[in-house]
Structures are given as structure tokens and as C-alpha cells.
Swiss-Prot record:
Binds 2 magnesium ions per subunit. The keyword DNA damage applies. Its EC number is 2.7.7.7. This is DNA polymerase IV. It is found in: Cytoplasm. It catalyses: DNA(n) + a 2'-deoxyribonucleoside 5'-triphosphate = DNA(n+1) + diphosphate.
């Protein structure tokens, strides 16, 4: 386990967009609600309240599918400018307690309060104070996780949702990690989890007891990362004012695909909606300069293609898909990904002065 013990808080707003809508319109509070696009325009759900989640509605789900699961679902369009203003207010609350703030999206952030003198230096009390300030000033709830390392703080913030917090003190880190299901580790998706389970790995203790070289051989970079996490090692620092250069999503298939039609179905129904939501949460106003597609074949050869394009446009991914499939040469496809490259802030400022 890492000997450097810090005080890390992960704050995650509860169903943020939907919560803002319910706050501003009391009639929405007692019914299933989602923020998203219209079903006739092949829209997707950005987020939904907990009432809607009882019916199986989830973010990145096509609106048409969500309405089948929950016919009484009210779907309202997003108000990104409002959400951004609320997010700015939330970050101003964070800054009262520490200057070490790493925003992950409009509704989520890491805070390092190791050297903070607020609340007698107690990370637990600071998390409580932040959540109280958010409620008193914005009438919104937040959940928090407190731990000595980043990944565990993020895991902890999900343990007492909504409107709660969970604290993992240093002396309990390893005991909590040992029983932690691998699907709770950030970065472990459905396909990775299936492969881990096939290897007899279900909780972190299984990984901790495994041979490092064998993990590296079987699972590559993921195996190395899981070995570290399972031993309580996460030396990543809270990065202040991190500028995001790109946003991407990808899907590894349990069964390889081959045809253009299969690829396009994945892009249209899964990847593009997920990318749109991720981009929206990361920074809805930041300019796009490129769109790209990544493809990995059954022989593990990876290829990417990207072209200059200044809008997030589904039709343009169709052109990129046609281009990248020229490199397929009959091979099956095991991974497909979409990405957008964002304009650097400095470049954007320079252009605005011209």
C-alpha cells in the first residue's frame, strides 16, 4: 500500500441535470423525469431522476427505448447554460475549502484537502460542509466519498447515494479494497469484467493474490492497473485546471463484427449518443476541431482516422467509417471507438483577438 496518505474528496452531484429541472419546476418532482432529446429526432437520455431509474431508464439510452420502459416518463430538453452557471457556483463553493480542485465534468470533481485548515482539517467535516453549502445555496443534493487515494474516493462517493457520503479511513483501505467487486473499479467495463471473471477474478483480493506477470500477460495495461489498485496503490495527484484535449468513447465486442452495417449500428445507437453526452458534460461550449474513428482488428492491429470538422455530426462519422473500412482487408473488428479533438484554450483566445 502507498505510504503517502492524503485526504481526497470526490463530489458527485445527484442526477444533476434532472435535479436542476426538478428544483426549477416543482411539478416535475413527483414523476419520472429525464433530460434528453425528442424520440422523433432519435434523441437520447442525458440523465434521469431516481423515479425514472426504477423503470430501468438510464443515461445514453435512446429516448424511444426509455419511453417503452416508462410510458409516463416526462422528457424535457436540456438547458446547458443553466447547468453551466450552477456548476460554476458549485466550484466556487469548493474553492472555499481548497484550491486543489480537479473538475471531471459539470457535476463531478476531485478535491485534495490534505493541507486545508477548514473544519479543523477534517476531510469528513469538509465534505459535509460542502454538501450543506450546496443544498443551502442551490437546493441541490450531492454525494461525497472520502479516502486517502483518488480511485477509492470515487468508489466511496457511490456507496451512499443519493445525498450521502462514505468515508474510508487509512486503516480500513485494504480491508475495503479486498472485498470490492472488480466492476466497481473505474475503467472496468462489461467486456473486461467478463474476461476477468473467466480467469477466476471477481473481487480485488483475487487480483491481489495473483501473479503480476501473469496479469500483465493476460490483461495488459488493465492487469497492471488492477494489481496496483488491489494493493491500495494510486499515486495520481489532484490535477488543478486540467485542460481536456479530447473526448472519446469506445466499445470492445464480446463477439467480433465484420460488416459496415454492424459498425454503423453500433455507432448510431451506442457510441454517438454516449459521445454526445460525455462531450456535453465535459465542456459544452468548447470548440471542436476534429472528429475521429478508432478501430482494432482481430489481429490486434489498431488504426485511427481523423479529419478536420468543427461540429459534432453523426453523418460525418459515416464518411469516416467508410474511409477506415478501406483498411479492414477482410479482418474481423474487435473494438470500435469515436472521438473529438477540442480546441486548446490558448489557441481559442488568440483567434478571438484576431
Amino acid at each position: 500500500m502507498s505510504t503517502q496518505m492524503r485526504k481526497i474528496i470526490h463530489i458527485d452531484m445527484d442526477c444533476f441535470y434532472a435535479a436542476v429541472e426538478m428544483r426549477d419546476n416543482p411539478n416535475f418532482r413527483s414523476r419520472p423525469l429525464a433530460v434528453g432529446g425528442h424520440e422523433k429526432q432519435r434523441g437520447v437520455i442525458s440523465t434521469c431522476n431516481y423515479e425514472a431509474r426504477k423503470f430501468g431508464v438510464r443515461s445514453a439510452m435512446p429516448t424511444a427505448q426509455a419511453l417503452k420502459l416508462c410510458p409516463s416518463l416526462l422528457v424535457v430538453p436540456g438547458r446547458m447554460q443553466v447547468y453551466k452557471e450552477v456548476s460554476t457556483h458549485i466550484r466556487s463553493i469548493f474553492s472555499r475549502y481548497t484550491h486543489l480542485i480537479e473538475p471531471l465534468s459539470l457535476d463531478e470533481a476531485y478535491l485534495d484537502v490534505t493541507d486545508s485548515t477548514q473544519c479543523h482539517g477534517s476531510a469528513t467535516l469538509i465534505a459535509e460542509a460542502i454538501r450543506r453549502d450546496i443544498w443551502n445555496e442551490l437546493q441541490l443534493t450531492a454525494s461525497a466519498g472520502v479516502a486517502p487515494i483518488k480511485f477509492l474516493a470515487k468508489v466511496a462517493s457511490d456507496m451512499n447515494k443519493p445525498n450521502g457520503q462514505f468515508v474510508i479511513p487509512p486503516e480500513q483501505v485494504q480491508s475495503v479494497i479486498d472485498t470490492l467487486p472488480l466492476q466497481k473499479i473505474p475503467g472496468v467495463g462489461k467486456v473486461s469484467l467478463e474476461k476477468l471473471n473467466q480467469a477466476g477474478l471477481y473481487v480485488c483480493q483475487d487480483v491481489k493474490n495473483s501473479d503480476y506477470r501473469q496479469l500483465l500477460k493476460q490483461f495488459g495495461r488493465l492487469g497492471a492497473s488492477l494489481w496496483q489498485r488491489s494493493h491500495g496503490i494510486d499515486e495520481r495527484e489532484v490535477i488543478v485546471e486540467r485542460e481536456r484535449k479530447s473526448v472519446g468513447v469506445e466499445r470492445t465486442f464480446t463477439q467480433n463484427i465484420v460488416t459496415y452495417e454492424q459498425c454503423w449500428q453500433v455507432i448510431e445507437e451506442k457510441l454517438f449518443p454516449e459521445l454526445a453526452i460525455r462531450l456535453e458534460k465535459a465542456n459544452p461550449e468548447k470548440a471542436i476541431i476534429k472528429q475521429g474513428i478508432k478501430m482494432k482488428f482481430a489481429d490486434f492491429q489498431l488504426t485511427t482516422i481523423e479529419h478536420v470538422h468543427h461540429e459534432l455530426e453523426l453523418a460525418y462519422f459515416r464518411e469516416l467509417l467508410q474511409d477506415i473500412l478501406q483498411r479492414q482487408k477482410g479482418r474481423e473488428i474487435r473494438l470500435l471507438g469515436l472521438s473529438v479533438m477540442l480546441k486548446p484554450e490558448e489557441q481559442a483566445r488568440q483567434l478571438s483577438l484576431l
